[in-house]
């Protein structure tokens, strides 16, 4: 029996609140059950040094967790003086995922930075970050079109991400913390709206998984992402 009696292919309740803060060009509070992430998009009229004069833009991301986003207080990474390996891995994943939805040449020589700050963690923070940051990025880019900075939108479509895994021998979708901590296999899947995969990260924490189980997990991810795309579209239509 899953927490809250969810079906194996059923994500947690998804809530996407746009324009959550007033200063950023795009801001979203995304909620997957008890996991809550604030995603903001900032537009800069410059690009990193390695892209100067190349005629294309850049999309990057930063990720962090507030000290009491978890059961016990975490020390701020700023207090430690450096980012942890997990943080760097996650923000690179977020950035790669979001670059897949943007024509960087059409964006022009400007950058969009997505800041993803976890305010409450109950599993799936990186996938929630990608899902929310996608909507924040769309709002920021649409703002460039609306104010005449861009004449053509560089957006290619929606991006969503979800966790899947095997818990007590059963493949399931959108793991919360109690499931994630007990999973024999843990996987994160990032997809485009048209069904193409951007990234698949999978690890057997215990018993190795079979090819058939891999296909089952990918199918669960596809079903879960379909519901996420619906939630994103509904939020953007509001």
Swiss-Prot record:
SUPFAM superfamilies: Ribonuclease PH domain 2-like, Ribosomal protein S5 domain 2-like
An example Gene Ontology molecular-function term: tRNA nucleotidyltransferase activity
Keywords noted in UniProt: Nucleotidyltransferase, RNA-binding, rRNA processing, Transferase, tRNA processing, tRNA-binding
EC number from the UniProt entry: 2.7.7.56
Keyword Nucleotidyltransferase found: yes
PROSITE patterns for this protein: RIBONUCLEASE_PH (PS01277)
UniProt: phosphate binding residues: 86, 124-126
CDD domains, per database record: RNase_PH_bact
InterPro entries given in the database record: ExoRNase_PH_dom1, ExoRNase_PH_dom2, ExoRNase_PH_dom2_sf, PNPase/RNase_PH_dom_sf, Ribosomal_Su5_D2-typ_SF, RNase_PH, RNase_PH_bac-type, RNase_PH_CS
Keyword Ligase assigned: no
Reaction(s) the record says it catalyses: tRNA(n+1) + phosphate = tRNA(n) + a ribonucleoside 5'-diphosphate
Enzyme class, UniProt record, top EC level: transferase
Pfam families in the record: RNase_PH, RNase_PH_C
One GO-annotated biological process of the protein: tRNA processing
UniProt record similarity statement: Belongs to the RNase PH family.
Role of this protein: Phosphorolytic 3'-5' exoribonuclease that plays an important role in tRNA 3'-end maturation. Removes nucleotide residues following the 3'-CCA terminus of tRNAs; can also add nucleotides to the ends of RNA molecules by using nucleoside diphosphates as substrates, but this may not be physiologically important. Probably plays a role in initiation of 16S rRNA degradation (leading to ribosome degradation) during starvation.
Subunit details: Homohexameric ring arranged as a trimer of dimers.
Name of the protein described by the UniProt record: Ribonuclease PH
Protein's organism: Actinobacillus succinogenes (strain ATCC 55618 / DSM 22257 / CCUG 43843 / 130Z)
Gene: rph
């Amino acid at each position: 029996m899953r927490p809250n009696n969810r079906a194996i292919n059923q994500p947690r309740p998804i809530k996407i609140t746009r324009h959550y803060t007033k200063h950023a060009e795009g801001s979203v509070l995304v909620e997957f059950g008890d996991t809550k992430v604030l995603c903001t998009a900032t537009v800069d009229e410059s690009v990193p040094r390695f892209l100067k004069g190349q005629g294309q833009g850049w999309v990057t991301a930063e990720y962090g967790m507030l000290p009491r986003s978890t059961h016990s207080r975490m020390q701020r990474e700023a207090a430690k003086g450096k980012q942890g390996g997990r943080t760097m891995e996650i923000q690179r994943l977020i950035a790669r995922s979001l670059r897949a939805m943007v024509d960087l040449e059409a964006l022009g020589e400007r950058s969009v930075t997505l800041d993803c700050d976890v305010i409450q963690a109950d599993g799936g923070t990186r996938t929630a970050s990608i899902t929310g940051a996608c909507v924040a990025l769309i709002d920021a880019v649409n703002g460039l079109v609306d104010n005449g900075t861009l004449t053509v939108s560089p957006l290619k479509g929606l991006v969503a991400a979800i966790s899947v895994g095997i818990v007590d021998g059963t493949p399931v979708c959108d793991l919360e913390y109690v499931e994630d901590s007990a999973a024999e296999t843990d996987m994160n899947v990032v997809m485009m709206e048209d069904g193409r995969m951007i990234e698949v990260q999978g690890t057997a924490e215990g018993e190795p998984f079979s090819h058939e189980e891999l296909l089952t997990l990918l199918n669960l991810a596809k079903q879960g992402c379909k519901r996420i795309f619906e939630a994103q579209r509904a939020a953007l239509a509001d």
